[in-house]
Design a protein with these regions (language model features):
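Catalytic P-loop NTP-binding/switch module of NTPases
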Residues: 1-65, 335-352
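Carbohydrate-recognition loop of C-type lectin domains
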Residues: 54-178
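Extended, charge-rich low-complexity regions and/or helical-solenoid scaffolds
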Residues: 84-92, 97-99, 133-135, 149, ...
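An aromatic-glycine-centered, glycine-rich loop/turn in mixed alpha/beta architecture
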Residues: 131-132, 157-248
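Extended, beta-strand-rich, solvent-exposed assembly scaffolds of outer structural proteins
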Residues: 173, 248-315
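Hydrophobic core positions in small helical hairpin nucleic-acid-binding modules
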Residues: 233-256, 325-342
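Small/polar beta-strand repeat architecture
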Residues: 302-335
Length: 352
């Protein structure tokens, strides 16, 4: 593809009034809009859009069709839905969420959305069009597999690397677009097939979203996960695995801390706290809460003084009520966070 190309040079001079002149090339914008050769699967997906409803926009699917027909080279995926199906119903409105290709600049995205506004004249009834940004939910996996080393000539490290590759391939093939669900059983089936020495596997699944706080300022965030959140359960001696909600580390007054739901001896609630990573001391007692039924998590008066790891975001992970499947709706996209995922081999002498 020629996308992002921005350095151009003439291959020859031009003659003006008998004299050779060297051309000077100025680039006003990098090349965009190119696309890979279509696969059979993409042809099956896109072909109906080329004959979309005779240029009439009646249903949400019609909006998707017309937009894709005109801007398909800029768009990785698109989803449209009626305002009546929105979490906060808005009748007379069609919502569209566009996941642009990675090489499309913010300026081009804005210009594309403005151009799409013009297609409203194709609607047979007066509808408003509103754009909703895609909401990315990352899957974290804590995978454990049982292996009998005597049943293979390969090392455990080699088997682990193969499992890591298979797991990444599963997410690449099955997630990353609208309406693409994560199914734990499908992933574990592929892992069990990596080697005859792999006797079984299991995985703990967490949903993760990210916030970008302004340091030294009180921040407020509302996260909506694509599935209900598990209910906190009291435990006499809770461990880190018992937390329903937990974040990666950030700084508060120079000390590493995490966001955790309240979880101590025989007490477990949906209240969120800032807790010292080193000592477990509660630094801020209440910075929000989460609703287990709706999957909505609210953070208020959150004031970090720094973010670790050279990143600008903080990862907030929640344990889903049903770890078997995470099925996104509307503008939700499921992705995979390999860096927040782990693989642990458990050796056994059993052969079945």
């Amino acid at each position: 593809l020629a996308n992002t190309a921005k350095a151009f040079a003439p291959i020859d001079t031009v003659t003006v009034l008998g004299a050779a002149r060297t051309l000077t090339v100025s680039t006003t914008a990098a090349a965009i809009g190119g696309d890979n050769k279509e696969t059979i699967a993409s042809i099956r997906t896109n072909a109906p859009f080329q004959y979309a409803t005779q240029n009439r926009m009646v249903t949400p699917e019609d909006y998707t069709s017309i937009i894709l027909r005109n801007f398909s080279t800029l768009i990785n995926d698109i989803c449209s839905w009626g305002g009546q199906d929105n979490p906060e119903p808005k009748f007379g409105t069609v919502f569209s969420s566009i996941d642009f290709e990675s090489d499309v600049t913010a300026a081009t995205q804005t210009a594309t959305k403005l151009a799409i506004e013009l297609v409203k004249q194709l609607a047979v009834i007066s509808f408003n069009v509103e754009f909703a940004d895609p909401v990315e939910t990352f899957i974290e996996t804590s995978l454990f597999y049982q292996i009998n080393p005597q049943l293979t000539s390969l090392s455990i490290n080699s088997i682990t690397n193969s499992i890591k590759s298979v797991k990444q391939d599963y997410f690449t093939a099955n997630t990353g677009k609208f309406k693409k669900a994560f199914r734990r059983s499908a992933m574990l089936t592929l892992i069990d097939e990596v080697s005859g020495a792999v006797l079984s596997s299991r995985a703990v699944i967490r949903m993760q979203q990210r916030i970008v706080p302004v340091v030294n300022t009180f921040n407020k965030f509302t996260l909506t996960f694509p599935a209900p959140i598990a209910k906190p359960a009291a435990n006499a001696s809770p461990t880190d695995a018992d937390y329903i909600v937990k974040s990666n580390a950030f700084l508060v007054d120079g000390a590493p801390c995490r966001i955790l739901n309240e979880q101590r001896a025989n007490i477990a609630t949906n209240k969120l706290q800032v807790v010292s990573s080193a000592t477990g001391t509660i630094i801020v007692d209440n910075i929000g809460s989460f609703n287990t039924a709706t999957g909505v998590l609210t953070i208020t008066a959150f004031r970090p003084t720094g973010v670790l790891g050279g990143s600008s975001d903080i990862k907030i992970a929640a344990l889903p009520a049903n770890q078997s499947a995470i099925v996104p709706e509307r503008n939700n996209i499921i992705k995979y966070d390999a860096n927040a995922s782990t693989i642990t081999a458990v050796t056994t002498e059993a052969d079945n």
